[in-house]
Amino acid sequence: MSEKKVPGVGEYDGPAGGWGALRAVAGAISKQMAVVRETSAMRRMNQPNGFDCPGCAWPDPKHTSSFEFCENGAKAVSWEATSKRATPEFFAKHTVSELWGWHDHQLEDEGRLTHPMAYDKASDTYVEVSWEEAMQRVAVGLRALPDPNMAEFYTSGRASNEAAFLYQLFAREYGTNNFPDCSNMCHEATSVGLPQSIGVGKGTVSLEDFDHCDAIFSIGHNPGTNHPRMLGTLREVAQRGAPIIVFNPLPERGLERFVSPQSPAEMLTGKATELATTYYKVKVGGDVAVLKGMMKYVLAADAADRAAGGPGKLDDAFIAQHTVGLDALVDDLNATSWETIERKSGLSRADIEAAASVYVNAKRVIVCYGMGITQHKHGTENVHHIANLLLMRGNIGREGAGICPLRGHSNVQGDRTVGITEKPNDDLLNGIRQRFGFEPPSAHGHDAVEAVKAIRDGRSKVLICLGGNLAVAMSDPEATFAAMAKLDMAVHIATKLNRSHLILARESIILPCLGRTELDLQAGGFQSVTVEDSMSMVHASQGRLKPAAQTLRSEPAIVAMMAMATLPNTKVDWQAMIDDYDLIRDGIEAVFPIFKDFNKRVREPGGFRLYIAACERIWATPDKRAHFLIGKGLDEDGPEVKDALTLTTIRSHDQYNTTIYGMDDRYRGITGRRDVIFIHPSDLAARGLQHGDRIDVETVPSQANGSDPRAVRGYTAVAYEIARGSVAMYYPEGNSLVALENYDERSGTPAYKSVPVKIVAAQQQAA
């Protein structure tokens, strides 16, 4: 980084974790809530008979420690269990017009919502309404639609299995499969791509597999911020000598070195564990090129070994017995030149072959990946090629090996498992029909992008959101905000105020709900819910804290209340299921047989793992084989534009998805600001710019992102050791540069990490 002093921009020399993490936890506690309440909450997080962290989906170990949480988990709990309240009195003091000018951090930092609220146009404020009136308004709005498919039912990955199951049941009895979901914006390429490759849209590894792997490849992921508890697992792998190979555009401290806050020796000495054996800074969007290069090396090493009289490096028996499509993949790889691979990836052939050599010489390999793989115009193809690489050497269905998509929100995978999908299969529809006695719709509905398009075009008029902040999470806020302002009705089930609540429909309603940390008392007693983590483990979660307000309702209860108000002739006994959540789980088990003995097994410490056929080398594909798949090649984004850079959006260390806990990004040296863009010093110099200059970021016309001009202005350039030709901005600020039409056509995932841009000097240069 340049020696030029820029306000709020510096360097962080410490490791991930360590005292920096503990200070951050203490700061989060002191800002949000009483220490006694906070300590009680933390001791219950991710523990048997406690509550599941409302943050990420990293699994819990079988034998938990006394404090089984991380820095960002502590922030998530502090944020939810805050002592601050957004009461009706708060809303009376602040018009929606005023609140629109607040920063997103300020909006949520006002604290927990306490009462149902409805927008009053005359005063330009949200005003308190009773639960009965709120439900009646929802029912009137839904019944007024001439077609159920004019309603959109959005789901956040924070929702429990029980809430999500009731939600999809309500929407389907109402008559639609319109289920835009937060997973559409993150790992949908996984949910679409992996079933085509191996027959299941989930990862194949368990936490125990990390104890047996011979190597880990981490691609497009930053666990230090997004899954901090994963660092403890990587630390153990590194300490036993297994190589960890990283491909990522930015250097991330959480992949470089780590001091475990649970290790007294490390905390006292400051001695960090080095994590990444080798760190390759691949160009943004260069992942397919890297994977193809690695597979070319595997083929070459296989041929060389056979020529020398060896057995080869491909797993011939596995390939012959379990797969199809290798010949076509080999032809595709042979037709791909190393010159193209090097140009697209930004890495040398020698570097790629060195990484591939580690892969070839390791018997059991795990590949972990995040949204750096999925949020591309070619995200599904990225996923296919990771599967291809693993299939070449039989690294699926083997102990210590497999594919590990690292999902974000704590139950985003579970929501999909229990029916949140716009494309229901026959098994799901038959299960609903047999258990609940109504005819569910079969026509495919809308994903997130299609939902926004339908709202924009006037084809959808009602939006109900089970959590989340859809307007801010979605690409192209200019188009998304304008679309949502056309709605007849918007209903938000939420714990805190966010910007989506301020985009006013003709009728706008906020329904406050319990958080994961809070006691849920129903007629049948205190209730627990369940969640599914990234490795298909299902376990119970029971809040332990007093609710933020006595007026709150649980998410399952709110969904059931809406259903009962809207569907006078319902076939479902909603009230019985709300009185006793065991009955919801009985319904889940009836519709989804993989939940056999659900209520019994979920009460066992640690819960249970759902059946993943690919783990047993059983492939749920049409021909019962795993598939080697090829894509469009490395030039699918169209011709390269001179002087264009490729933008990726990233999270700061002080945020989780659209929730911004604070304005710092400790591991990248940013303090008190978010208006920065990370760029390689050479890319700055080539444009006559310097570290600290104020710049404008403009899109360039492209096949993927369209020709409409888009820009963000007045950002500060931060010289950073990011891959050449790549730049990074924080999400959601960078969403303004992503066209609504810029998404992976196979999965519908917005291409938040595939945006061609140019940077130019802003008119004013004061940093």
Locate the predicted segments by residue.
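Short cysteine-rich clusters marking metal-coordination/redox-active sites
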Residues: G50-C56
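Short, solvent-exposed secondary-structure boundary/capping segments
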Residues: E721-G734
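Low-complexity, highly charged intrinsically disordered N-terminal segments
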Residues: W79-T125, M135
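Long, low-complexity segments enriched in small/aliphatic residues
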Residues: A576-R666
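Cofactor-pocket helix-loop regions in the catalytic cores of large enzyme subunits
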Residues: S2-A24, G111-S410, V418, I432-L610, ...
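Long, low-complexity intrinsically disordered regions
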Residues: R746-A767
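Short Cys/His-rich Zn2+-coordinating modules
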Residues: S30-A41
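Glycine-rich loop/turn
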Residues: W102, Q106-D120, T648-V676, D693
